[in-house]
Amino acid sequence: MAVIYYDKDCDLSLIEKKLIGIVGYGAQGHAHAQNLRDSGLKVIVACVEGGRGWKKATADGFEVMCVAEMAKKADIIMMLAPDTSQAKIYKDSVEQGLKPGKMLMFAHGFNIHYGQIVPPSFVDVTMIAPKCPGYMLRQVFTEGAGAPSLIAVEQDASGKAKELALAYAKGIGSNRAGILETTFAEETETDLFGEQAVLCGGTTSLVKAGFETLVEAGYQPEVAYFECLHELKLIVDLMYQGGIAYMRDSISDTAKYGDFTRGPRVINEDTYETMGEILGEIQDGSFAKEWILENQAGRPVYNSLRRMESEHLIEEVGAELRSMMSWLKKKK
């Protein structure tokens, strides 16, 4: 049974006198920093000097400095730079600022779990991972609600790492929605699997396969786009709101019967076997090794695949159709 913490389990006073340093002011960084500040906590931000994050954090009223300076000053250091940058940032600028009594925090376990960052034994190492994008973490906080988070403790040098992490979670508003206890290993492996097999890799491959099947059978690409991509949001929103059963109760009986009888033919035993292989590559570290080496080599495979995918017909058709949808506003 999952252990979930709520407001009664979180004591904000534990970190009220501590200085919190946020590394990065991007998608998650801005939300963490602003929520913590609005909770009455002391926050400083570390970014690349003169960069977009530096300018934005300064405009938002934060004291901004280089990472090395922040690491010396802060009692709690939350690593919110991109995963692929964190190991270098840590080695170059954070490690030398760590002292007994400090806590190093993460919002994703990749670098700790796969040994890219190895903190000294005298610091607490914890994770608070909000289960939503940064803009939503900020939005629900300003509305008086909160987003759920995962909590994990990798090192408890102080003897109160969990309590301190729970206080941080309250600072960003997760006490209002629930803070589920996990481990760095479980968070990392399930997060990667979800991205690869379902949320990103699985979904985009399914959408493209459906689109290509219809187009190759002679149907208009525009109609195929609507049926296989555009309407996906309607179904996902229903599942998000009330689960799979709620979604099925909200669609026609014809759609439901097709779901029950044809869905398992698309996602079949072969798919389960492949999913197991993908999970195995995550668990044994082979995916992490592949991705780390890809970055070290300058991302040749990544860049080639990204370019190829951007040229898919579904992108051309989608751009044309979306340009006529006045309610869609492209984010700047």
UniProtKB/Swiss-Prot annotation:
- InterPro entries annotated for this entry? 6-PGluconate_DH-like_C_sf (IPR008927), KARI (IPR013023), KARI_C (IPR000506), KARI_N (IPR013116), KARI_prok (IPR014359), NAD(P)-bd_dom_sf (IPR036291)
Catalytic EC class: oxidoreductase
Bound cofactor: record note: Binds 2 magnesium ions per subunit.
Q: What is its EC number?
A: 1.1.1.86
Q: Which cofactor names does the annotation list?
A: Mg(2+)
Superkingdom field: Bacteria
Q: Name one GO molecular function term.
A: magnesium ion binding
Active site positions: 108
Q: What is this protein called?
A: Ketol-acid reductoisomerase (NADP(+))
